[in-house]
């Protein structure tokens, strides 16, 4: 899935859209996405000017954005609905557990986001998320999301 289709599923835009491409996706199971981290990212101006490091919270946000796409597509599949995003639907990041930051992410890295659906209960979707660079784990977390909007899944 390319950037144009990603924009149909996520309301985020520059500079907060943190996914460049979906590599693999199996609804109700997993998603693999990537973010090419460049020296031109606006957050590097202040984090840190002499030693650029991607803020850990943005690595978590990138994982949550991947989870959002997986959640919307999975909810549609579970309900037997067409695989189309809702015009007024939005997916909210509502919780994080067990977050661990293991390595830094720097300009030139390709961040691979691997998110697996754990469960869905009472409108809350739980995901196991992992971010890697060159096969080395940089961040892990359990992420919770929910959807809202008239036509939300």
From Swiss-Prot:
Coiled coil: none
Gene: fabZ
HAMAP family: FabZ
Reaction catalysed by this enzyme: a (3R)-hydroxyacyl-[ACP] = a (2E)-enoyl-[ACP] + H2O
One Pfam family linked to the record: FabA
Keywords tagged on the record: Cytoplasm, Lipid A biosynthesis, Lipid biosynthesis, Lipid metabolism, Lyase
One term under GO cellular component: cytoplasm
SUPFAM superfamilies assigned: Thioesterase/thiol ester dehydrase-isomerase
GO terms classed as biological process: fatty acid biosynthetic process; lipid A biosynthetic process
Organism: Dichelobacter nodosus (strain VCS1703A)
EC identifiers of the protein: 4.2.1.59
Compartment list: Cytoplasm
Active-site residue list: 47
UniProt-recorded Gene Ontology molecular function terms: (3R)-hydroxyacyl-[acyl-carrier-protein] dehydratase activity
Protein name stated in the entry: 3-hydroxyacyl-[acyl-carrier-protein] dehydratase FabZ
Top-level taxon of origin: Bacteria
Functional description taken from the UniProt entry: Involved in unsaturated fatty acids biosynthesis. Catalyzes the dehydration of short chain beta-hydroxyacyl-ACPs and long chain saturated and unsaturated beta-hydroxyacyl-ACPs.
Database matches in Gene3D superfamilies: Hotdog Thioesterase
Entries under InterPro entries matching the protein: FabA_FabZ (IPR013114), FabZ (IPR010084), HotDog_dom_sf (IPR029069)
UniProt similarity note: Belongs to the thioester dehydratase family. FabZ subfamily.
Main location: cytoplasm
């Amino acid at each position: 899935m390319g950037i144009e289709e990603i924009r149909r599923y996520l309301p985020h835009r520059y500079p907060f859209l943190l996914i460049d491409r979906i590599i693999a996706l199996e609804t109700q199971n997993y998603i693999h996405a990537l973010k090419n981290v460049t020296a031109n990212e606006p957050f590097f101006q202040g984090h840190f000017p002499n030693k650029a490091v991607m803020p850990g919270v943005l690595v978590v946000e990138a994982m949550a954005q991947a989870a959002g796409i997986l959640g919307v597509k999975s909810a549609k599949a579970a309900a037997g609905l067409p695989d189309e995003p809702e015009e007024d639907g939005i997916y909210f990041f509502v919780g994080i557990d067990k977050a661990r930051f293991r390595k830094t992410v720097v300009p030139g890295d390709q961040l691979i986001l691997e998110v697996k659906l754990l469960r869905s209960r009472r409108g809350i979707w739980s995901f196991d998320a992992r971010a890697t660079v060159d096969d080395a784990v940089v961040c892990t977390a359990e992420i919770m999301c929910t959807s809202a909007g008239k036509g939300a899944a």
